[in-house]
Design a protein with these regions (language model features):
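Flavin-dependent oxidoreductases
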Residues: 1-78, 82-91, 99-110
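C-terminal catalytic lobe of FAD-dependent flavoproteins
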Residues: 42, 50, 59, 73, ...
């Protein structure tokens, strides 16, 4: 058995082994504000699907990120993550991020007056439908994938690992996870 769980490198590793992994690195953007006085440390994570935003408390600051529908492909010249790349950043593209930041002001008005401490633009792996890729690939028996978490890998890893192990051991799973099955493509 083989489990491919290599994040944004999964597609090109799949290509190198004759397996199609529909996952692509795209630019992912977020900002971290300057410290905000009296910001609750137990603030819930806010996900605004209408405006493609997520917001969360980050050590007394707010992190505002986006999962936009029209993302910018990363490494578009080669369509491959460079072999020497190690979670670096891309040049700032505030023009792309600004409309989303402005939309966040209606959700959390105090953001309008908050300073920006950090602007981040870096690669993250995304699938065409933004759902995770799990299961046995159609091209190679006993070759499983567990990737394409679109920035939610840490939170999903335990359950995805459990399901992948069950799939490998039993040849099937109890849950209906077709929306995540790599064979949906």
């Amino acid at each position: 058995y083989l489990v491919l769980a290599t994040g944004m490198w999964s597609r090109q590793i799949g290509e190198d082994t004759g397996v199609n992994i529909p996952l692509y690195p795209a630019e992912h953007f977020y900002i971290i504000t300057e410290p905000i006085k009296d910001l609750p440390k137990d603030l819930a994570v806010l996900r605004d699907f209408d405006d493609s935003l997520y917001l969360k408390e980050d050590a007394g600051k707010l992190l505002v990120g986006i999962f936009e529908g029209k993302s910018i492909p990363a490494f578009s010249k080669t369509n491959r993550v460079p072999n020497d790349f190690s979670f670096g950043e891309f040049p700032e593209n505030f023009d792309h991020f600004e409309p989303y930041l402005e939309a966040s002001f209606k959700r959390v008005p105090l953001l309008e007056n908050a300073g920006i401490r950090k602007f981040f633009s870096g690669p993250e792996s995304f699938t065409p439908d933004t759902n995770t890729l799990l299961g046995e690939v159609p091209e190679v028996k006993n070759f499983f994938v567990c990737c394409g978490f679109n920035s939610i890998g840490i939170g999903s890893g335990g359950g995805a690992g459990k399901v992948t192990a069950e799939w490998m051991m039993n040849g099937h799973i109890k849950e209906d996870l077709f929306i995540y099955d790599i064979k949906r493509f």
